[in-house]
């Protein structure tokens, strides 16, 4: 009862790589498409209301904005009752401003989660004629499946492609698809291995003339440039292209339904699926995997319900109309130096915004299962990836004001930017929240009553401060609660997740671990924001996808300073008052225990032990499509000669 995949007995094992002298990979005849760079200073929104926009979309968005405003207004009114009696000082004004912004942030997530919960429970939200319960449609057009790669393990990569290829073949419609491995690899030994493993794959599945390999000599503009190069060379032959990631696996059934959705809706430019995170082995990966399974649909259905035909693009596991992409998604180079200037890093948001500006509808179909990806195995790997995303999202500050964008597209970018600024804002809120009673109550170590922030706040507001805390925690944790309720209402999913009790224990443990890691994430995200603002570029490295194996020296280098700071802060707080130390306890404990917490959650044996106990379970393999039997993580590790 888990999301771990084991190889199918019927799967042909990949032979070991014994040499690097592969034959020359083939490519189809070129069919160029012009893909001009878009001008961000000129342009207008071509179609304001899309034909495929769901009915009542204005009412839905009014609910989101109005619900967010109403919830925030109530919380601000209670906060004012805490601050107002003695007048509002400068520090209290700063506290109030931060509180308004941060509470509005979580209130918007709360409103989306409520909408998503209603949609999930009602089994609603299906659109574009894509119904997974109906017979598989017959396709009329050709589609290219693109798998970009950058210094990845070729055997792992192409095991995933084999899984997809065989699953598409099982639908009986393989003749409508071609498969492309688009390599941006810069390491020669990996590039040579890619060619060899590619040829082995073609021989094994008889994929010559249908599976193609192309390696760029100049990997300009990273993944966005990789895909754009393919569009300019081969895009004219394919009305649709399905973008994959190096760890993506999709079922043939899902792929065929996505293509049919594009064929039947000629004004749709993109359909984004909700990838389920699978193959987690470490404790960290398994808790992320479980959370994505239980809470993820609640959030995703809410987002899809409110965004309508202006949904976003996540860069992979999505199908795109090739001509629309070529006409409108050519990314310009941003003015200025890195990290804000240069090539657009988080290209997916910008490509979606430009395609919507060009008049194309953008949809998300979270109910369509059969779309999978893998998550980072450790918190460290997540934060390394998050640092790149931080730079890419902050770079959107140069794009959000582009002419002609739909206001929902601008909101996507502002939310991405805000996600990273909330980390330092939470830190400031906590520091000011402690600083106000210190400044107002004074520090009298010899007094009869020790200093207590709780006594200060309660005394100033007749207990209203505690209601602010309760309200904030409820709004923060509501998506987890709603996810659990939705799980209880789905007996099949509930059994697959270990039953009501084990699922509740899993949610509780995930919440505790997330709370312990929250100060670490807050600190490192804040540092990432300041590094980007200071002009430090994140670079571009291959993502770690194997089980975490973190050495103690590496852990001390990464988290030693944070641990020392947490212990120091705890000692100072205790010297002032034990009550102050208790008030700051969650942050102090998270920082002080960062090394053991990261180490524990990075262990495979810890994750597997909890799996055997029925904790952090997701539906068992037997309920999943056969394509899950050959995922990237099940391929034998590739060993090559580095010389």
From Swiss-Prot:
The protein's Enzyme Commission number: 2.4.1.-
Positions of disulphide bridges: none
Xref: CDD domains: Glucan_BSP_MdoH
Keywords carried by this UniProt record: Cell inner membrane, Cell membrane, Glycosyltransferase, Membrane, Transferase, Transmembrane, Transmembrane helix
Region (Disordered): 1-32
Localization (cell): Cell inner membrane
Composition skew (Polar residues), residue ranges: 1-13
Gene3D superfamilies associated with the record: Spore Coat Polysaccharide Biosynthesis Protein SpsA, Chain A
InterPro entries: Glucans_biosynth_gluTrFase_H (IPR023725), Glyco_trans_2-like (IPR001173), Glycosyltr_2/OpgH_subfam (IPR050321), Nucleotide-diphossugar_trans (IPR029044)
KW Transport (keyword) present: no
Enzyme class, UniProt record, top EC level: transferase
Entry keyword annotation includes Glycosyltransferase: yes
One record GO biological process: glucan biosynthetic process
A GO cellular component annotation in the UniProt record: plasma membrane
Superkingdom assignment: Bacteria
Molecular-function GO terms, alphabetical: hexosyltransferase activity
Transmembrane feature ranges: 62-84, 99-121, 417-439, 466-488, 554-576, 581-603
Function: Involved in the biosynthesis of osmoregulated periplasmic glucans (OPGs).
Family from the record: Belongs to the glycosyltransferase 2 family. OpgH subfamily.
Protein name: Glucans biosynthesis glucosyltransferase H
Source lineage: Bacteria, Pseudomonadati, Pseudomonadota, Gammaproteobacteria, Lysobacterales
Gene responsible for this protein: opgH
